[in-house]
Amino acid sequence: MRLIQLFICIFAISSNNVKSDEYNGVVTRVIDGDSIIVKENGDLNKIRLRYIDAPELSQDYGEESKKFLQNQLLDKSVLVYTEYNDRYGRQLADIYIHNETESIYINAKMIKSGNAWVYKTYRSNSYLINLENHAKMNNKGVWSSQEPLKPWIYRKNMK
């Protein structure tokens, strides 16, 4: 079953017809709930997790989201699938952890646990949207709040 989920994730990612690059590295720092630093062959790469938007650190649930991601990734080996760099020079990427029994798609785990929203601005991803709906129904993470404020609205209000 896990193998099928992995293939579905990879298909959803690769179906965007954009050339991707992949590499292995170690997460040396978690900046917030959707940004990390990955060391690859001595280079430090700033990564923004693709398709998700986590609460800002100054926002409700921002620190919790960061801590969740730290527990998942800090000092661990990861597989990075990067598509392109954003306007801030960060690599937009899908992050995976592999262990003996499974591959874990971290972007999806952040959504499923209620630690991030699906970032629908550029593209919809039905797999992640379904995970978000499940997290909402189960009041997980940010969804435990009556009316959670979406990070992109929070940032807009802070300007």
Name every feature range the model reports, one short phrase each.
Residues 2-159:
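Small beta-barrel nucleic-acid-binding modules, primarily SNase/OB-fold domains
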